[in-house]
């Protein structure tokens, strides 16, 4: 999947996460979280795993975490990535 435009998913409410995805020449992940010292590596690993499953190798991803659970983070990354592409989504692969 190729990222072709800027897209956002999520909110800045407590227990949620806002994920911003935009075109970039390589994979760049920025994590802003109050719990980054404890969970920063896990947050980055989850983002990388979701992007790999979607076949994304070049994008800038900015994560503004407010204490979201892992499943919420996965859903927000998927939603932002799908909004940021013009490609037809293969729903069987996504689910």
Swiss-Prot record:
Localization of this protein: Cytoplasm
Entries under InterPro entries matching the protein: CitD, Mal_deCO2ase/Cit_lyase_ACP
Lineage: Bacteria, Pseudomonadati, Pseudomonadota, Gammaproteobacteria, Pasteurellales
Family: Belongs to the CitD family.
Designated name of the protein: Citrate lyase acyl carrier protein
Record's keyword terms, sorted: Cytoplasm, Phosphoprotein
Modified residues annotated as O-(phosphoribosyl dephospho-coenzyme A)serine in this record: 14
Organism: Haemophilus influenzae (strain 86-028NP)
GO cellular component terms attached to this protein's record: cytoplasm
Subunit text: Oligomer with a subunit composition of (alpha,beta,gamma)6.
Entries under Pfam families matching the protein: ACP
